[in-house]
Amino acid sequence: MMKLMLFSIIVILFSLIGSIHGADVPGNYPLDSSDDTYLCAPLGENPSCIQICRKHGVKYGYCYAFQCWCEYLEDKNVKS
């Protein structure tokens, strides 16, 4: 009985930790002067996307779905 209780507590704690750290980071796809998204490859951390995101006023971005995604980029800052 004690092992079951301990196991249940551990499962609950890991569930709570996962929900805290699993939160989505807000952001946007930046747009160029033609209202197009910036295409990119390879996926993941991408120096080109980081540079584009810095141009749009945020510190970090990456290549997601072959388009640059900038973390914490607000709607008002999408177009450069």
From Swiss-Prot:
Q: Where in the cell is it found?
A: Secreted
Question: Using the chain's own numbering, where are the disulfide bonds?
Answer: C40-C63, C49-C68, C53-C70
For this protein, the parts annotated as crossing the membrane are none
Query: Which Pfam families does this one have?
Result: Toxin_3
Gene Ontology cellular component annotations, sorted alphabetically: extracellular region
Cross-referenced InterPro entries: LCN-type_CS_alpha_beta_dom (IPR044062), Scorpion_toxin-like_sf (IPR036574), Scorpion_toxinL/defensin (IPR002061)
Which GO MF terms are attached to this record? ion channel inhibitor activity; sodium channel inhibitor activity; toxin activity
The protein's superkingdom reads: Eukaryota
Describe tissue expression.
Expressed by the venom gland.
> Which residues does UniProt assign to the signal peptide?
1-22
Alphabetically sorted, this entry's keywords are: Disulfide bond, Ion channel impairing toxin, Neurotoxin, Secreted, Signal, Toxin
**Which intervals of the chain form a coiled coil?**
none
Sequence ranges assigned to domain LCN-type CS-alpha/beta in this UniProt record: 25-80
The UniProt function text for this chain reads: Probable neurotoxin that inhibits ion channels.
The record's domain comment reads:
Has the structural arrangement of an alpha-helix connected to antiparallel beta-sheets by disulfide bonds (CS-alpha/beta).
Give the record's family classification: Belongs to the long (3 C-C) scorpion toxin superfamily.
Q: What is this protein called?
A: Toxin-like peptide AaF1CA26
Species of origin: Androctonus australis
Q: Which gene encodes it?
A: aaF1CA26
